[in-house]
Regions:
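Conserved small/polar residues in nucleotide/adenosyl-binding loops
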Residues: 175-184
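N-terminal signal-anchor transmembrane alpha helix
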Residues: 14-21
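Membrane-interface helix-boundary motifs at transmembrane edges
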Residues: 73-82, 160-168
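Cytosolic-side transmembrane helix boundary signature
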Residues: 145-173
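Alpha-helical transmembrane segments and their helix-start/interface "positive-inside/aromatic belt" motifs
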Residues: 2-13, 80-89
């Protein structure tokens, strides 16, 4: 039980750390916009984004929380595959969002929200008109690399068999129950 709780908290705080690190990466990528900013301003950006990071980490930790609960009844290979599949999905999702956000900010001048998605789905030709082929290829490569890095982090800290195997399933055998029953009858 303790290992599951530690794993759940580790998953949550890992998501929070990833989101917190994305802000300075974005600022570093657009360092010309932030060249006059002091270190305290960089930390203020992280601080002001923390409530959103905490809530999004909570949303993304809901499925692992259910998987941790399910692991109390058994650690099957199916559960492990679901676990790995979820983190592959999250790695790809986070890499697509972060990479598209980096790429579109240069052209549109604001961070990714529902507006670019609406614009893309209403007129896809106009949405990608200012983007070169090399930018698309580079973006896809960056997404792949970032997704692989994220999954590597998730695998190293959460998904390896050594880490996954620490969640012991409580086993209750028939002989253990009989011995406990006998002790209770003697008292």
């Amino acid at each position: 039980m303790k290992e599951r709780l530690i794993g759940f908290l580790k998953t949550y705080f890992l998501f929070v750390c990833i989101f917190m690190l994305q802000k300075p990466l974005f600022m570093f990528f657009y360092q010309t916009l932030y060249e006059g900013a002091s270190w305290t301003e960089w930390f203020r950006v992280i601080w002001h984004g923390l409530p959103l990071d905490l809530s999004l980490a909570g949303y993304l930790t809901a499925v692992p929380g259910l998987l941790f609960i399910g692991s109390a009844w058994g650690l099957s290979n199916l559960l492990r595959r679901i676990w790995c599949g979820y983190f592959i999905f999250v790695s790809v999702l986070l890499s697509v969002i972060f990479t598209v956000d980096l790429g579109l900010y240069e052209y549109w001048g604001f961070r990714l929200d529902a507006t670019p998605l609406f614009y893309f789905f209403s007129s896809p030709k106009d949405a990608v008109a200012s983007v070169s082929v090399w930018m698309v290829v580079g973006g896809i490569l960056a997404m792949g690399v970032y997704a692989a890095v994220l999954y590597g982090i998730f695998h190293r800290l959460l998904l390896r068999k050594a880490v996954f195997g620490r969640m012991k399933v409580p086993s209750v055998s028939y002989t253990h129950l009989r011995a406990h029953e006998t002790k209770a009858n003697l008292v």
